[in-house]
Amino acid sequence: MKQLPILEPGDKPRKAAWYTLTCPGDKPCPRVGHSCSYFPPVGEAEKGKVFIVGGANPNQSFSDVHTMDLGTHRWDTATREGLLPRYEHASFLPSCSPHSIWVFGGADQSGNRNCLQVMNPEARTWSTPEVTGCPPSPRTFHTSSAAIGNHLYVFGGGERGAQPVQDVKLHVFDANTLTWAQPETHGSPPSPRHGHAMVAAGTKLFIHGGLAGDRFFDDLHCIDIGDMSWQKLGPTGTAPVGCAAHAAVAVGHHVYVFGGMTATGALNTMYKYHTEKQHWTILQFDTSLPPGRLDHSMCVIPWPVMSASDTEDSGSVILSLQDEKGDAAEKPETRSGGSREESPTTLLLCFVFGGMNTEGEIYDDCLVTVVD
């Protein structure tokens, strides 16, 4: 397989192209089942960071945390004090505390977990807060994109081996009140499954695919948290095949799905779903495709570039990531002027780290592609 082009700091990536990021420093070792979160900048001088939390290889579960600084483009280790080893867990950054990373569930070699842990943004240590309400049973639940506002939404997950938990309730954790709840829902929920992609876009949660025993699902379900009604969707276009252990992110009205596994191997395809038009598109790339993979993790990151623009007649559009309602979104601003000049522009990239193929090869690569 051909090598992907390397994206250097300041380079302007093309659409319909995959790139590799090669940042120096203390990089995470090859792993699966980790979480991948974009951490917004704390000060004006910062550009934000990507946090890789936990994960596993065939020999062990990890309790380490690595960060990629998007300003210096270097890897470093972050605090691991207090973090329990886990893989195939969920992570989220609630709007009430956007500089705290929460993790839920997952597993280590001894079994599944259902505890919540949070990284204190100032002390940089992990703690296990006391919560109220009825938590979900211990399970694997691998997502970094199933949160809206202060709430993490949990549906399904892994019980043991290829078997999912039989629970089809929607579990909701409120990071502001430290409370679990199981709200009443309407309609028919998805059948029990694990390894599904679950992603929030606006006020809706989308669930695609997953696995139960030897059955791979290709269905797409949605629940709107406004009315708590489940809906099985019948979208048009070219939809992903039945798969599991894939990853998804949301940008505005689009959901991007990449990778996963089928009964015949690992996938390296990316699909885009338009949430308003209910239409799937398989994306075509001008570059080589990355190696097929499963059990990887993704997030959306900003990528600043310089571009020449004539500001006399029209402003230059600046894009930024918003952490509102758990979505990555585009926020236009304009800058006016009277001459042609180099102006900063921020693109949005889908950032992919790690995973493995079905032959047992585990990855530690960083992949990016433009999303909009």
From Swiss-Prot:
Residues 322-342 have a biased composition (Basic and acidic residues). InterPro entries: Gal_Oxase/kelch_b-propeller, Kelch-typ_b-propeller, Rab9_kelch_effector. It holds the Pfam family Kelch_KLHDC2_KLHL20_DRC7. Interacts with PIKFYVE; the interaction recruits RABEPK to the endosomal membrane. Interacts with RAB9 in its GTP-bound conformation. GO terms for cellular component: endosome membrane. The lineage of its organism: Eukaryota, Metazoa, Chordata, Craniata, Vertebrata. Kelch repeats lie at residues 49-95, 100-146, 151-203, 204-250, 254-303, 349-372. It is found in: Cytoplasm; Endosome membrane. Rab9 effector required for endosome to trans-Golgi network (TGN) transport. The keyword Repeat applies. This is Rab9 effector protein with kelch motifs. The gene is Rabepk.
